[in-house]
Amino acid sequence: MRSPKNTTQMVGLNVVYDDDDMPRKQEQGQRLLERMTQYAAAADIHMQTQVRVAANIANGIRHAYKEFRATEILIGMHMHPEVSQKFWGEFHQSLFNGLNSQIIMARLTQPLATIRRIQVAVPSRAQFEPGFYRWLERLCRLGSNLECHTEFFGREDVLPLIENYVLSRHHDMRVSYTRMAHWAELPSLAASISADNLFVVVTARKGTVSYKNALEFLPDEITRHFSGSNIMIIFPDQHGDAMDEMTFAQPQHTEEHSAYEAIGKWIKKKL
């Protein structure tokens, strides 16, 4: 998802609660970050790591984000109901409501390298978001690097813009475009998603140009129709499209703050 010309380092972040279990969680977090560093090194990417202690996980991530002058966040979605019954987990809503930068949330049930198809649901008016081309560039690079077919679903006003961008920047990419007249058609896409597919949903924050009330039902729709699928959810950047840096933030604990539901663990062997 990252440009090979980009030499800016990644940051691997693990935030743990400041409680009696902190020493053990710090040790676990450090071991996880060491594995992440090895994966990054195998791809010739330098990664700086930090285990951070915080009373509030979302605030801990936000403070680290500012300190490292990061440009976006990639964070895991949990798959463990014993951790949290909520789709968004306990702190993620506070995170994406508190940061206007691009946030990518992912839940992978298999190594990323084994993905054979990417399907992307794009909401109406997505082209008017400042970060439209940022997430599009990320997905184009992902599809090209995995050498898998990418299919974009969206309305007739946004698909030509995506097609023009792909033709001009990633003309060798295997790609197709399918009209999705209304967001209510989202559940119907589940029938075409296989176990080795990645389903990507481009969503929106409340108050932004592409936000719609139907997005409030996204957690229920994903839980009901895409529960076993590899999922990626993208909150577009609200500042622009400087397409270069990415930060990795790995959640380890949850806290109360939610209106959606699932997210917490990813990245161990997914890169």
Spans of features found by a protein language model:
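Hydrophobic pocket-lining residues that define ligand/cofactor binding sites across diverse proteins
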Residues: 2, 65, 143
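Cytosol-/stroma-facing membrane-proximal "stalk/adaptor" domains immediately downstream
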Residues: 25-29, 33-106, 113
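Non-transmembrane accessory domains of multi-pass membrane transporters/channels
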Residues: 1-33, 41-48, 125-130, 134, ...
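Active-site-proximal loop/turn and secondary-structure-junction residues that shape catalytic pockets
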Residues: 16-18, 53, 79, 156
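A short, well-structured beta->alpha microelement
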Residues: 47-48, 52-64, 155-156, 172-192
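Intrinsically disordered or low-complexity boundary/linker segments at protein termini
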Residues: 71-72, 77-164, 169-183, 194-198, ...
